[in-house]
Amino acid sequence: MKKLTLKAPAKVNYRLDVLRRRPDGYHDLRMIMQRIDLCDEIEICLTDGPGIRVVCGREGVPDGPGNIAWRAADALLALSADKPGIDISITKKIPVAAGLGGGSSDAATVLMGVNELLGLDLPEKRLREIGVTLGADVPFFIFGRTALAEGIGEELTAIDRVPAAWIVVVNPNVPVSTAWVYQNLQLTGEAARVKIPRFFESVAEVCAILSNDLESVTIPRYPVIGEIKRELLAAGALGSLMSGSGPTVFALFEEEDAAVRAAEMMRARSWFAAAVRTI
């Protein structure tokens, strides 16, 4: 049967502004989202079936319908006249529940892969519409470009000129509840007045707009996040920020050597750390 092996990249948020709470309980956001070359590997295979099987083997990641990748495959299988079995194997490299979008990226990759394997030929716009029913970040990974994301994250505008950078990501392995972060966030309205550029000429220009409203909640509760930011800046980073609701921190470097040294320094603290490129 047909098979695909695909990479599902992580993301960082160069900016995350929380604008307002919506009547449906979600929040309107304004984000700059950037993919990075820290990737899960996903193998998708059509079988004689029936049914969908997901195997991951990572603690905390379900293998059945509780896995967002399973639900992605199920959503496309429902649109297919043929009903083959679908086997999905996920090799996790992206830390789980870390603010890096790993689950959403896995789901987006499965949507694109199953769309190809089943010959559905659904356009990107339709895949993004399906994706947002699975998770707010899923459309971004289908979009596949650095983007300004608005609404709950599904309204995407390409940012066409963004310099490549070395990114060091550090996860201190502390559990952070996204729901708790948003429940405790005090909205100020200040972010809405900040103008966001549509292009950047240098890494320094990117660093000038780094901001994450959720840090005001997460860092007081988990001071290690602020500590990591300070250490990365001391190691030569041009800028550093918490990604998403945390706990992962990332930092931008212009030179590979400095990024690799900083990642090694962080791993010496028994934290997950990687030096990767933007994509």
Curated annotation (Swiss-Prot):
- A GO molecular-function term, please? 4-(cytidine 5'-diphospho)-2-C-methyl-D-erythritol kinase activity
**Residues reported to bind ATP:** P95, V96, A97, A98, G99, L100, G101, G102, G103, S104, S105
Q: Tell me, which GO biological process terms does this entry list?
A: isopentenyl diphosphate biosynthetic process, methylerythritol 4-phosphate pathway; terpenoid biosynthetic process
- Catalysed conversion reaction: 4-CDP-2-C-methyl-D-erythritol + ATP = 4-CDP-2-C-methyl-D-erythritol 2-phosphate + ADP + H(+)
Task: Describe which pathway this protein belongs to, using the record's wording.
Answer: Isoprenoid biosynthesis; isopentenyl diphosphate biosynthesis via DXP pathway; isopentenyl diphosphate from 1-deoxy-D-xylulose 5-phosphate: step 3/6
Q: Which parts form a coiled-coil structure per UniProt?
A: none
- Role of this protein: Catalyzes the phosphorylation of the position 2 hydroxy group of 4-diphosphocytidyl-2C-methyl-D-erythritol.
Q: What is this protein called?
A: 4-diphosphocytidyl-2-C-methyl-D-erythritol kinase
